[in-house]
Amino acid sequence: MPHPLHRFFRVITLLVTAGPAAGAEHSPPWLEYAGGEGPGEGRRVVLIAADQEYRSEQAMPMLAKVLSTHHGFHCTVLFGVNDQGEVDPTMPVYPEDGKEFKEHHIPGLEQLASADLVIFFPRLLTLPMNERELIVQYIDSGKPIISLRTGNHGFHAPLPYKINGRQVDWGEVVGGSFMGHHGNWQADSTRGTPVAAQKDHPILTGVSDIWGNSDVYRTYEEGGSLPAGCTALVWGQPLLGRNRDDPPNPQLEPLPVAWFKHWQTSESKSARVFQSTMGSGTDLQCAGLRRLIVNAVYWAMEMESAITPTRSVDIVGTYCPLESGFHYTELGIVPKPVSAYK
């Protein structure tokens, strides 16, 4: 019969051995992609994936891999999650009859404080006040901002952001909010054409063929224009269908789908801002759109001297984004652990 002390030490050994394995199951609720050699070495990009329609949960990890692997940026992807900590694009954005409305949640927003750039891809979120405050601290810091697709209407509950006592709308920061679909939602697609007058802008370096199967957003009234201080970079022409070679809709004028501006913070710091209303998971299968956004990453951090027309924007590994939309069962969209998107 083993000595009691032998049994005691055996139990301790088993506990110590099991400890790390058990702890390994509790990985952080975000994804990290280490940077390395490249122009972005030593710079940190945080990407926020928290929409319900355009598969940001697939698009942002793909973009993070491109930026870290080909360009050297350290990338962190934060997700909107449910009560179980799962990435959940199915969470409602408005109260539903007879159901408790639950606030959205993005773990890890504290990391915005150490970011050199944040790429926003939320949609109509109602976040707890402490999380909204973390976002405001970043956007008022003077650091650069990139917003993709639904990012221009990313927050339903207003951010607690005031300058000189006046409430600041998120749309003011990024240069215009969503005002409707310019054409037919889920029926049109978009051909992007660089604005001729901006052909030499660094963000357009090497950018030519842009197409995505999402439709064009309207961000200003008919007959109007982008807000003062915004400079259009890409025109979006609605097409009569969702195929790359479909003809343009002759009844719909092209509208800006990408622009840049500078945001003046409460302390008069100037932040570089880039908005693309293209950027769905399937849109980003287009190399031209990926190059536009990667170039914008460099420009936003005042690294435009490192932009070249040949830097790789190739997808790393496999990328098979699901289609956009809210028919979650048909599309196969269910809550998943963060690790499923690695």
How does the language model describe each region?
Residues 3-14:
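Sec-dependent signal peptide recognition
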Residues 13-24:
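Hydrophobic h-region of N-terminal signal peptides that target proteins for export
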Residues 24-40, 58-59, 69-70, 81, ...:
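Extracellular ligand-binding/catalytic regions of CAZymes and related secreted enzymes
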Residues 31-33, 46-48, 52-154:
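Helical hinge/lid and interdomain linker segments adjacent to catalytic or ligand-binding clefts
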Residues 37-42, 110-114, 138-141, 224-227, ...:
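Extracellular/periplasmic catalytic domains that process cell-envelope and extracellular macromolecules
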Residues 41-42, 148-245, 309-342:
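An acidic, glycine-rich "communication" segment
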Residues 50-53, 186-192, 204, 208, ...:
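Active-site rim elements
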